[in-house]
Amino acid sequence: MSGMGFLAVGVGAALGAWLRWALAILLNAVNPALPYGTLAANLVGGYLIGVAVGFFDTHAGLPPEWRLLVITGFLGGLTTFSTFSGEVVANILAGDHVIGVLHIVAHLGGSLFLTMLGFWTVRTFS
């Protein structure tokens, strides 16, 4: 592990986490049963990981620190499986089973779809 790699991951993670926090502040109050900030972070992150993987696949000559900054750091800090899991469990424990299932479908289905779309975007327009 290089010092620059360590720095790239740390800076990227801080920026991603700050964006996730901003999305939570802006969007979670809209509907507490389905916190849109967490959903937005995971869907945007899903799309951007597809774009990033496609981009780095076609730009293999870039220094590895860029991939660490964007994918491991920024997108790792932006997306959040633990918050998503906690929100789903809270819905289920509150008896809101339908909301819990919709939460799962929106996060997983939406993120997978947008990851494919992001990858397709880079492949199509490169």
Swiss-Prot record:
The keyword Cell inner membrane applies. It holds the Pfam family CRCB. The chain crosses the membrane at residues 6-26, 36-56, 69-89, 99-119. One of its GO terms (cellular component) is plasma membrane. One of its GO terms (biological process) is cellular detoxification of fluoride. It is a multi-pass membrane protein. It comes from the Bacteria. Fluoride-specific ion channel. Important for reducing fluoride concentration in the cell, thus reducing its toxicity. It catalyses: fluoride(in) = fluoride(out). It is found in: Cell inner membrane. Signal peptide: none annotated. Na(+) is not transported, but it plays an essential structural role and its presence is essential for fluoride channel function. Coiled coil: none annotated. The gene is fluC. One of its GO terms (molecular function) is metal ion binding. Its main location: membrane. Na(+) binds at G76, T79. Keywords: Cell inner membrane, Cell membrane, Ion channel, Ion transport, Membrane, Metal-binding, Sodium, Transmembrane, Transmembrane helix, Transport. InterPro entries: FluC. It comes from Ralstonia pickettii (strain 12J). Belongs to the fluoride channel Fluc/FEX (TC 1.A.43) family. This is Fluoride-specific ion channel FluC.
